[in-house]
Amino acid sequence: MEFGLSWVFLVAILKGVQCEVQLVESGGGLVQPGGSLKLSCAASGFTFSGSAMHWVRQASGKGLEWVGRIRSKANSYATAYAASVKGRFTISRDDSKNTAYLQMNSLKTEDTAVYYCTR
């Protein structure tokens, strides 16, 4: 009985930690090669304005690939991009909405992937 209560307590703690930070992506869809798409990442549970935000992606059957990042206002909102997307993708952010964006233009078939934001 004592073990069971401890286990339930541990699960409750882990669930609480898991829910502390939330990053919710939206805006995905199907587009033709050459098209455009804008993804959004709504953040909560941490100080968004002071955090760098990154985008990564994972194509089917492949590992994670870093796409790019945007730093905080204190770091002049500096951006950096993977060579594969530079000049086509643009990362921006709206600190008042706790949201980061990934504008993807001139899309290629090789851009097909699941996209994630992270901090």
Swiss-Prot record:
Job of this protein: V region of the variable domain of immunoglobulin heavy chains that participates in the antigen recognition. Immunoglobulins, also known as antibodies, are membrane-bound or secreted glycoproteins produced by B lymphocytes. In the recognition phase of humoral immunity, the membrane-bound immunoglobulins serve as receptors which, upon binding of a specific antigen, trigger the clonal expansion and differentiation of B lymphocytes into immunoglobulins-secreting plasma cells.
Complex formation: Immunoglobulins are composed of two identical heavy chains and two identical light chains; disulfide-linked.
Keyword tRNA-binding on entry: no
Single GO cellular component term: extracellular region
Cystines in this chain: 41-117
Residue ranges, annotated region (Complementarity-determining-1): 45-52
Extent of the signal sequence: 1-19
Keyword Membrane among UniProt keywords: yes
Annotated region described as Framework-3, given as residue ranges: 80-117
Recorded GO MF terms: antigen binding
SUPFAM superfamilies referenced in this protein's UniProt entry, alphabetically: Immunoglobulin
InterPro entries (UniProt xref): Ig-like_dom, Ig-like_dom_sf, Ig-like_fold, Ig_V-set, IgHV
Ranges where the Ig-like domain occurs: 20-119
Protein name (record): Immunoglobulin heavy variable 3-73
Region (Framework-1): 20-44
Cellular compartments annotated: Secreted; Cell membrane
Region: Complementarity-determining-2, residue numbers: 70-79
Organism field: Homo sapiens
Region feature Framework-2, mapped onto this chain: 53-69
Region (Complementarity-determining-3) location: 118-119
Gene3D superfamilies, per the entry: Immunoglobulins (2.60.40.10)
A Gene Ontology biological process term: immunoglobulin mediated immune response
Chief place where the protein resides: secreted
Keywords: Adaptive immunity, Cell membrane, Disulfide bond, Immunity, Immunoglobulin, Immunoglobulin domain, Membrane, Secreted, Signal
SMART domains per the UniProt record, alphabetical: IGv
